[in-house]
Each structure stands twice: as C-alpha cells, then as structure tokens.
Amino acid sequence: MSSATAAATATIAAAAAAAAKLAATPAPAPSRRRLTLRGNPTARRCVAAMAVSTPRSAAAAAFLERRESERALHFVKYQGLGNDFIMMDNRDSAVPKVTPEEAAKLCDRNFGVGADGVIFVMPGVNGADYTMRIFNSDGSEPEMCGNGVRCFARFIAELENLQGTHSFKIHTGAGLIIPEIQNDGKVKVDMGQPILSGPDIPTKLPSTKNEAVVQADLAVDGSTWQVTCVSMGNPHCVTFGTKELKVLHVDDLKLSDIGPKFEHHEMFPARTNTEFVEVLSRSHLKMRVWERGAGATLACGTGACAVVVAAVLEGRAERKCVVDLPGGPLEIEWREDDNHIYMTGPAEAVFYGSAVH
C-alpha cells in the first residue's frame, strides 16, 4: 500500500469514527433558541466530511434517521456546480426551523457552516409533493433557485431512500417546478415559462420589443449597458456588453465592483440578479453572475436559463445551449413547442452536520 493510499484510508477511518462518536453523543437540552455557531467553537458540533453514494451508506442513513430523536439542528450540505446550500428536513412543519437571521449566521463562511443559502424541505401544498423555501446568505428570501432545486431533488431522494429515476412536484415562490432525477445522477428540471413583460419582472425599463425589455439602455457606473430583462420567477438582468464594448470578456470583470450597482439600480424595484455573458458560439455561452442577496456565486441555474432566453431574443444563440459558469456547465433548452425551459445539471451531498439550538 502506498503512503498516499494509507493516508487516505486513515482519513476515511477517522471520519467514520468521528461520525460514530457524534451519533452516540446525546444532544444537550436547549435553554433558548440560539444557534451556537458564532464565537463559541466549543459549543459547535460538526460531522467530518464523508462521501455519499446511492444507495446511501449506512453512516449517512444513521445520521439522517437521528433527526426525530435528538434536539439538535441537523443539516446536509449540498452543492450544484459550486453553488452550495445547507439543506434542512422541515417536512414536519410549514414553519422554517431557523429564522432569516439564523440562516445568515449559518451561511457565514468564517463563523458559520458557510453556504450561499439555507433550503427547507417542507410539506407540499396545492397538490405539490413538497414545498421549497430558501433563505439567502444575507437572510433575504428569493422566489426560486435553479441550482437549489436540483439539490432539493437529490436531498428528497436521500431522505426517502429512493433509487433510480424519480420526478417531484415542488411548490416554490415562483410556482410549480418539476425536477427529474436521471439515471446518470444529474437532475433535469422543467423551469416553466420565462416572464418577459417588464412590469411583471419587475423593471421600470421601457419595453423595446412587443412587451419585452430587449437590449434596453441602462446607465451604470458611467457606461451605457445594453440589457435584456427576464424573470424565471425571480428577476434577471442579462447583458452581453456596453454600447462602447460590443464583445464582453467576462473573466476581466470585477463583479464585486459592478455587481451591486446593477442589483440596487433604481430601475429594479425588487433588486435584480445580473448575468454578464460572453458568446463562444451559437450553442455555447459563458457567463458570470451577481446574485441578488448572495453576491458573486459559482453558478446560478435560473440565471443560466435567463441567459439563453436573452441570447435567443437578441439573435445571438440557438434555443439549446451549453452555458459555462465558474462552477461548471449547465445544459439549457428553451423549447418552442411549449415555451418551457429545461435545465440539466449535477447536484451532490458534501457533508453532514449538526448545530445546537
């Protein structure tokens, strides 16, 4: 056995031992509702990272089954192309297990678990199988999240111990979303129809093409950007460049400077997500995103959908594209027959953890 193999084996064994020790440790009785993640490392309890497979491992199953028997806040960390979420089993209540303020603390990458948001699996309503709610890393609540809904589907399969292909009806703030777990482990999601009417997005920019806001002028930071606005249940402002700079090289952008100026622009009364796009070919796009309430992230599923819609409306791309994001590629198709957008991409569990509350 090589030294590298031996080290890896020892690491896995240590992780399993840590998980077993945690499972045997009784959770302290709560005195009042307060997350003990910030500023108190001795009170924080985390499980060592472990790999997750389907069917789920015995260690993963044991951890998930502890939910009903202990008074600790259990979670599973998931990621989709680097867009990461703290997933919580909230099927027993329509009230989230943590407040927006507590969610922001959990998402803190220095004093908390670290994530782009907290997602709750809640009871379904209006004929849906489940309800999905999200708190962003700043505590705000978005209507939907494309990468998050893929993680949501994989988390449900883990909770219900489901194998093979499955689809679910998910109630979200953006309406009914239907993800399908495929045989290769990827999740294909029917994201519904894009909303193009300016007031419904919402944006105060005037319509330029029928009722749609396509290649409208938007003054930001001394430049006139040409933007197309799309809602995927949440607002998106898509730009391929300024009037002065027709071809955008997205890697050259400093998102931390320009992103907030789009997000909080007066033309977007509900704020906006912003996608900066580079056209590689008519079926291949590259984007970077500044997300409303989360900032620069490695991926945004609804953003990738909005980008393809905008590219089609501007005559830059076909209806089926690969969209490269910093975290990896997504397959996006805007079908002409039903006007629905379909997104396909990965989602996987990263680790399991607990926080006393």
Swiss-Prot record:
It is found in: Plastid, Chloroplast. It is an enzyme of class 5 (isomerase). Pathway: Amino-acid biosynthesis; L-lysine biosynthesis via DAP pathway; DL-2,6-diaminopimelate from LL-2,6-diaminopimelate: step 1/1. The active site is at 145, 300. Signal peptide: none annotated. Its EC number is 5.1.1.7. Residues 1-47 form a transit peptide. It comes from the Eukaryota. GO terms for biological process: lysine biosynthetic process via diaminopimelate. SUPFAM superfamilies: Diaminopimelate epimerase-like. Its main location: plastid. PANTHER family: DIAMINOPIMELATE EPIMERASE, DIAMINOPIMELATE EPIMERASE, CHLOROPLASTIC. HAMAP family: DAP_epimerase. Belongs to the diaminopimelate epimerase family. This is Putative diaminopimelate epimerase, chloroplastic. It comes from Oryza sativa subsp. indica.
